[in-house]
Amino acid sequence: MIEPARLTRTLNPKTLAVIGDVSRTNYRWLRCMSTFQGNIYSVQIDPKEIPGIEEMGIKNYQSLTEIPEDIDFVLVAVPRVAANAVLKDCINKGVAGAAFFTSGFAETHVQEAIDLQKEFTDIARESGIAVIGPNCMGLYNPAAGVRFGEKQAVGFEGDTTFISQSGGHAGDISAAAYANGVPVNKVVSFGNGVVLESADYLEYFGNDEQTQFIGMYIEGLHDGPRFTKILKDVAKRKPVVLWKGGMTDAGRRATASHTASLAGSDKVWDAMCKQTGALQVESVDEMIDLINALRLLPKFTGNGLGVTGGSGGQSVAMADTFARAGLRIPDLSNGSQEKLGSWFSLVGASFGNPVDMGSNREQVDVILDTLTTAENVDCLLVQVRPPQDDDEDRERMQTQIDSLKRLKSTTDKPIAVIAHSSTPAHDGSAIADLSKTLREESIPTFISYERTASVIQKVLEYNQNH
């Protein structure tokens, strides 16, 4: 059992060392850690590598024990055969924790590697050192400037922590979170998880006051009952979004060779999520969408949607998509329809629900106000078409944004935007700009009917159970 205080030092280091970085990778780990806010050291015994390290302004030592101060966190990038010796050096130095990028252990299914991992595990567990990995990317802590990718942003604090068995997914999740305005507290990539596994991180961050939302990517478990117990406890107190890899036969085979984990059946995982209150997703995009919605939307427990902004055909598509997700687009009351009808004389316009969007600010305001005040509408969804390279398009969208900002300041009902378009001219940058503008008003944006329906249904499910 790792002491929580030791794990806290590991995840929030004031000092760190990188062991084994080399010029072949252009000293990737030392470059990643160049943003670290504390003291950083290198340990490298190869004389050919030392000049390149010192040119970076980093002091190199021949041994970890030579470093003249206590070390909180170590990133280890040495060959597999040296891993156990380096682990012992970390223990002798009194290091709080270490992330082992080193791979080639039990995930290879080679007996020699399996035996080496067992020896590694026994040494670590006996000492009480907090080991992340092996076969992992380690830690991303933006506030401390600890990174495992050079493009990861730093210098901010967040309320969302991601725990990932996959290093690749950990990188993708951190990038997607930053791009979509989800403020990261920590990202931990734990790989084989021989000392600290998913349940340990979940328990720790479940008790972490800075972490209000948890996202997890898991391929398999060492102790299913313990994980389930902890998940049930944590999910009562904060949202836990779970993405399970290896849910198909092909995925289970890939899992075995990736992190040497037992994947388990999809039915077992589905049942566990329902039992514990965890929210299950199937991709990075869905995880980020859902966490953004949980962070930004006021709590609602009814499934009635007020929808506006689409054409006739789009309204039909939205109605079908939301209905399949168990959501309702209720008819508006006679009073609401009469209010809309008295304002508009547009040929071909629909004043039912979904409602066609108006063409000027006054019309847009009336439509949004009418839908928001309707008693059988619990959540408002507004389709906003990102502009093409056209002044009229930009003016139309700005009218909708201004009206949404006004509405947000006058209602407690949740509002979300669908930035849906099949037009190639509506590129990603336009949607990203729109999403950023609306996030500043606590209005989440989704880029398809399907993603919107999935997220709203899951948020509703969470709200109804908490």
Identify the role of each PLM range.
Residues 1-466:
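Catalytic-core regions of core metabolic enzymes
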